[in-house]
């Protein structure tokens, strides 16, 4: 069954040494509110491994019930004159101590992307996660995601990558893909990186996506303490 959800993907700029405080504030205090008031589920709040990209930063991923669920979420947030949910005024005030802003995307999942519930049931989790942003030829995001399922995922599974989700970015020219995978250990991640240069199948995959993928950039993420994939519990 195709995944019917829509996702909000957030890159959060952290102030100083407040990443752990922000991640706890987001998961412990906002996660349950999002679920009960908006049916907005936290897939993950991860810390970016600074050596692999910008820091200090978190990556947040939220699951909603399709486009209508997202529309209801926006109405809930922006209906008032302050353009802010009144019940979250205190939450926002505290969060302002920990973050300075961010950059968000709306993501549409590939049909083979597991929902949060399915990911928990399958035991998808890792000591570390890979987060890949792929720039594709405009109009080719769906093509890339199909190729990913048919040709890359068998290789990825053999190497030790578990798919958390593969998504195309909405509200752009069908030109960006986000792929998040779980890796069981740091040692396994090191083996995967070594395979990029040495594994014949990896080289074949890169040649196959020439003309579809323009460029990509990967970074590493680690779980926050209350991450649902880590605990096996929806917030």
Model-flagged regions — what are they?
Residues 2, 20-44, 50-55, 63-107, ...:
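An amphipathic, aromatic/His-enriched active-site/gating alpha helix that lines ligand/cofactor pockets
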Residues 2-21, 109-187, 225-230:
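Surface-exposed interaction/gating patches
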Residues 47-48, 118:
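Catalytic micro-motifs at enzyme active sites that drive phosphoryl/nucleotidyl and oxygen chemistry
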Residues 233-235:
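C-terminal/domain-terminus segments
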Residues 51-59, 172-178:
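The conserved glycine-aromatic submotif of the RRM
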């Amino acid at each position: 069954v195709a995944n019917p959800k829509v996702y909000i993907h957030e890159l959060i700029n952290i102030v100083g040494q407040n990443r752990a405080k922000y991640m706890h504030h987001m998961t412990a205090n906002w996660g349950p509110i999002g679920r009960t008031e908006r049916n907005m589920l936290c897939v993950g709040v991860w810390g970016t491994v600074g050596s692999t990209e910008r820091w200090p930063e978190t990556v947040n991923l939220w699951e909603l019930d399709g486009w209508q669920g997202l529309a209801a979420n926006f109405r809930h947030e922006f209906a008032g004159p302050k353009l802010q949910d009144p019940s979250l005024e205190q939450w926002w005030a505290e969060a302002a101590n920990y973050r300075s802003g961010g950059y968000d995307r709306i993501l549409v999942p590939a049909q083979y992307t597991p929902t949060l519930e399915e990911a928990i049931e399958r035991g998808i989790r890792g000591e570390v996660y890979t987060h890949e942003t792929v720039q594709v030829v405009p109009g080719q995001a769906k093509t890339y995601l199909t190729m990913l399922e048919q040709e890359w995922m068998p290789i990825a599974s053999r190497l030790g990558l578990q798919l958390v989700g593969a998504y195309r970015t909405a509200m752009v020219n069908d030109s960006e893909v986000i792929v998040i995978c779980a890796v069981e250990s740091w040692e396994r991640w090191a083996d995967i990186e070594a395979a990029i240069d040495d594994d014949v199948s990896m080289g074949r995959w890169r040649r196959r996506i020439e003309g579809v993928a323009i460029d990509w950039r990967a970074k590493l993420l680690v779980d926050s303490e209350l991450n649902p994939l880590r605990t096996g519990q929806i917030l």
